Amino acid sequence: MSNRTICLINDSFPPVTDGVANAVVNYGRAITESGDKAVVVTPAYPGADDSGFSFPVVRYPSIDMTKLVGYHAGFPFSEKTMQTLMEYPFDLIHCHCPITSAVLARELRARIHVPTVFTYHTKFDIDIANAIHAKLLQEGAKKLLVDNISAFDEVWTVSHGAGENLRSLGYQGDWRVMPNGVDFARGRVPETDVHAVCRDFDLPENVPVFLFVGRMMWYKGLRITLDALKKLKDGGHPFRMVFVGSGGDKDEVVAYANELGLADRVFFTSPKYDRNVIRAWYCRADLFLFPSTFDTNGLVVREAAACELASVLVRGSCAAEDITDGKNGFLIEENADSMAALLAKLCHEPEVLKRVGRQAQEEIYISWDDAVHRAQRRYEIVI
């Protein structure tokens, strides 16, 4: 098998930080380290420095749409960009966003005649509803999205639930589950690192610590968590809770926690871009609370598992697809009463938490190297 050159196209890429940008970075890294070649194509961004990547990054003209969609949207009709891309001997185009990136990918395919793959990462119906309020325009945006995706030779989704969501938008083609990975190695960080991240917080020994890492948005199930913690406190159960992250709803979330009288045991800290700091938080916690039905893959659940930390998830959610209740994680109904009842029980069962955390590491952890190598094997079939 000869070395391949893969074109990776996405709307977001560092310095923009989101789950899909992280996926593209890891695809580029793992493909390059395997001996193949990767080229990332992404919109220009003010102050972006791509010199630290081990693969080429081609930036094309963009429009600042931060207020609407949270990032700079690419302008996919740049002839100069197309001429630059045509100089690369691409064997396959792998697109990770169904909007401007997909338009660019389709135009490039029309020029160089190579196969295309699309990965569906996000429930775009929710993003569309948040960005566009007119129902008729929402339906038009969904149709455009589905038309773009349907044009690819093969469609991947990061979970079965993501595939079902794509089907609900009107997509009628086939899809294949290709899960994303985690950029953490299996195992814990040194205890000195754990003590360093939590030294400014009141986290007594022998008191269970719950954790959330991610965007501070209500649709992540944060109200369920806070209401459950209120019930836990009223029931006299000792605990601490740490939220790590930022997001558009953070101020409201903090205010609601204070309103519930949880300020003495629920703490908020800003997002951490040092991955070892995030790993240290996973290692300090006793249980990860993630009652989100929005996420298509729940990578944070696999990150937690890398550090032997079990998660509480909503039964039937995408994040819970690989979870067996009480074996490698814990499942609840999508309400605060269900979470509170489980936490009240687990607060007094530290050995159960440790056992289930170890099993989570064994059963649901997948590294980015393994995930991308699986993708590369599939590339060969598509090519």
Segment roles from a protein language model:
Residues D325-G326, F330-A336, A344-P350:
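Conserved acidic donor-binding segment of nucleotide-sugar-dependent glycosyltransferases
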Residues A310-V314:
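Short hydrophobic beta-strand element within catalytic cores of glycosyltransferases
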Residues R265, V352-I366:
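A short, well-ordered alpha-helix in the C-terminal region of glycosyltransferases
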Residues V254-K272:
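Nucleotide-activated donor-binding/catalytic signature segment of Leloir-type glycosyltransferases, i.e.
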Residues N22, P208-K231, M241, G248-V254:
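A conserved mid-protein helix/loop that constitutes part of the nucleotide-sugar donor-binding site
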Residues I149, P271, R279-A285:
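Short alpha-helical donor nucleotide-sugar binding micro-motif in glycosyltransferases
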